[in-house]
Amino acid sequence: MDIKRTILIVALAIVSYVMVLKWNQDYGQAALPTQNVASSTTTSGLPDTATGNNAAASDDIPRAASDTSAPAETPVAASKDLIQIKTDVLDLSIDPQGGDVAQLTLPLYPRRQDRPDVPFQLFDNGGERTYLAQSGLIGTNGPDANPAGRPIYSSEKKTYQLADGQDKLVVDLKFSKDGVNYIKRFTLKRGLYDVTVTYLIDNQSAQPWSGSMFAQLKRDASADPSSTTATGTATYLGAALWTSSEPYKKVSMKDMDKAQLKETVTGGWVAWLQHYFVTAWVAPKGENNIVQTRKDSKGNYIIGYTGPSLTAAPGAKVETSAVLYAGPKSQAVLKELSPGLELTVDYGILWFIAQPIFWLLQHIHSIVGNWGWSIIFLTMLIKGIFFPLSAASYKSMARMRAVAPKLAALKEQHGDDRQKMSQAMMELYKKEKINPLGGCLPILVQMPVFLSLYWVLLESVEMRQAPFMLWITDLSIKDPFFILPIIMGATMFIQQRLNPTPPDPMQAKVMKMMPIIFTFFFLWFPAGLVLYWVVNNCLSIAQQWYITRKIEAATKKAEA
């Protein structure tokens, strides 16, 4: 039975690591070769779902369902004078041509820990990368469907900033054509990462006006600037959307390479995911929209939607809107914004364990104020919950140590006759009331918790650049000096010394190698995860030592 226990432990070690790598295959999107794409000073492109009979100015502007003509390739120079909008949490730049969000940074999230003055950049359409949020009006009279080029909006100022004591900032961009006045309004609020984009159409012409709003995210195939590079820590880079049948449907770049997706949904959202951050367009509730993914001629990947047709009689007004979110993957915020959007915080197949773990971590952190100490207290809580199971396991192992001399005698008695040896061992275990697999139960229980915590530390933006103490300045990445993994290996070795030695020499050698194997695996794991395992091992050693000594004392007393 000892060989079964050894095989089980080795298998669990291998399976845990393979599961991590397999998760990366499913959820991690390898960066594709960077395409040569147009910058914000050259061509600004849009989706492929427009409405109306006008050809689009670029192959990535949408066409309406009634439009059967192919979009025209008409490059139009975008304005170099971007409109700057700043709040306490967002810093974005609007391109007057089309009113797209061409640049966006997050002041509260430094790009690197050693450069707190350089904010992390989400949207970037400056030449080296293409990643922006686009919206417009298409269809029969939509100005963004004009083959001569997208509309050039004007604004009262070139810079807008949320002032102290001000909770809301409204920025209006204006454009007029053929007797129709358009206002593209951006509404931002203090402390929020969502921006409401509203179109107000005032038809002062003698003809009826009709059109549809589209909203989309366009990105090239460049690598995720927020991802880590350690072994086994790649995360999903790609698109996702909401449908009535699937509240969270991923569409990778490879999927877009193979085929276009086109679905009709009510409400919902479309998003682009990367490590720790997400951008999304959220459609109005109850509105029937056409969601589409595609790849344009420049190699950019697009996900977006086109809303229902709008009409305005002569002298009438009409408006429509959508919400753009660009910020961290905060589950509470995303859930409130739109159903299913919180699922972009992807904890993998063990999400049902990971979510309660994160909930506990959050509540502990609200008390102690440090994520490292939160992990330590969480570990203590988990060990307390599983103490009865652990106690039973340690009692079983203590009994195994007690019968070790008898097992050695059986081995000497039966020699190389494995069948008789196994039968004799089973009889001895039965007589002594020992469960030979009892020591494996804590490992079986802890593995799902271990893997779930791994994904919590990997996916939760709260862990990004979260310091602990001393040399651990970021719990979400590997220990820079590999001190914690070495300590973890040492605790495994000590814990192993407390366990009964397998009677078979080969098994004993395999067991001695386990701390080395685990230490190697843990070298590249997030420091927060290794911290959990170190504390877990230390508590296990204390529990096992206490229970073993208690049983030995009781045995000596009974024999006396």
Curated annotation (Swiss-Prot):
> Member of which family?
Belongs to the OXA1/ALB3/YidC family. Type 1 subfamily.
Report the gene name.
Answer: yidC
Extent of Polar residues compositional bias:
38-56
Quaternary organization: Interacts with the Sec translocase complex via SecD. Specifically interacts with transmembrane segments of nascent integral membrane proteins during membrane integration.
Instruction: Please tell me where this protein is predominantly located.
Output: membrane
What does the organism's lineage look like at the top?
Answer: Bacteria, Pseudomonadati, Pseudomonadota, Gammaproteobacteria, Pseudomonadales
| Protein role | Required for the insertion and/or proper folding and/or complex formation of integral membrane proteins into the membrane. Involved in integration of membrane proteins that insert both dependently and independently of the Sec translocase complex, as well as at least some lipoproteins. Aids folding of multispanning membrane proteins.
Please state where this protein is localized.
Cell inner membrane
Single GO MF annotation: membrane insertase activity
InterPro entries named in the record: Membr_insert_YidC, Membr_insert_YidC_N, YidC/ALB3/OXA1/COX18, YidC/Oxa/ALB_C, YidC_ALB_C, YidC_periplasmic_sf
Region Disordered, as annotated, extends over 38-76
Q: Which NCBIfam families match?
A: PRK01318.1-3, PRK01318.1-4, yidC_nterm, yidC_oxa1_cterm
Q: What is this protein called?
A: Membrane protein insertase YidC
Species per Swiss-Prot/TrEMBL record: Pseudomonas fluorescens (strain Pf0-1)
